[in-house]
Structures are given as structure tokens and as C-alpha cells.
Amino acid sequence: MLHTLHRSPWLTDFAALLRLLSEGDELLLLQDGVTAAVDGNRYLESLRNAPIKVYALNEDLIARGLTGQISNDIIPIDYTDFVRLTVKHSGQMAW
């Protein structure tokens, strides 16, 4: 399943998101959700320990001035890659 986090993790039920992640799922951070990718924030460690790949939409990182601040564990992607993720996963959950 593809999970998309478009809101700040501080304004989301992040614990519920983590509970619903399964091995093989993927998480895309976009819009204000990209703040979860900033190195050193409290949500990043939970994402590192999850059995998933975590991506961040590069355009949203650039728009928020965060490109130099994200963790190396987060994979920046563009809109073409976003489309590939949606095609790959038949189910999607938006947060």
C-alpha cells in the first residue's frame, strides 16, 4: 500500500499511521508532510524503524527550503516517480 502524508506530522495522528504500516508498504511525504524528513526531528526515528521505504516529493522540499536538511534515509523523488508509485500500489491511504 502507498501511504501519503500531506500534513505536518505534528498535525496528524502519526501513531495511527505507524500502526497501519506493513512490510512492503511505501510512504510518500508531500506538501507539509515533507517536514517529517528533516534530520533530527522526533518522527524520523520512527520512520527509520518502520519496515518501509520513505520518499519525499522534491518539489515540496525545494518549496519549503528543506533540501539540505533532510535525512539520508529519505529518498527524494519527482512527480514522475510519484506516478510510478501510484501505479505500483493498488491501494492508497492519505494522511
From Swiss-Prot:
InterPro entries linked to this entry: DsrEFH-like (IPR027396), Sulphur_relay_TusB (IPR023526), Sulphur_relay_TusB/DsrH (IPR007215)
Entry annotated with the keyword Cytoplasm: yes
Record's keyword terms, sorted: Cytoplasm, tRNA processing
Domain of life: Bacteria
Primary location group: cytoplasm
GO biological process entries: tRNA wobble position uridine thiolation
Pfam family, one: DsrH
Subcellular location, record wording: Cytoplasm
GO-annotated cellular components: sulfurtransferase complex
Key word DNA damage present: no
Quaternary structure note: Heterohexamer, formed by a dimer of trimers. The hexameric TusBCD complex contains 2 copies each of TusB, TusC and TusD. The TusBCD complex interacts with TusE.
Function: Part of a sulfur-relay system required for 2-thiolation of 5-methylaminomethyl-2-thiouridine (mnm(5)s(2)U) at tRNA wobble positions.
Family: Belongs to the DsrH/TusB family.
NCBIfam families tied to this protein: PRK13510.1 (NF010035), sulf_tusB_dsrH (TIGR03011)
PANTHER family, per database record: PROTEIN TUSB
Protein name: Protein TusB
Species per Swiss-Prot/TrEMBL record: Escherichia coli O157:H7
UniProt gene name: tusB
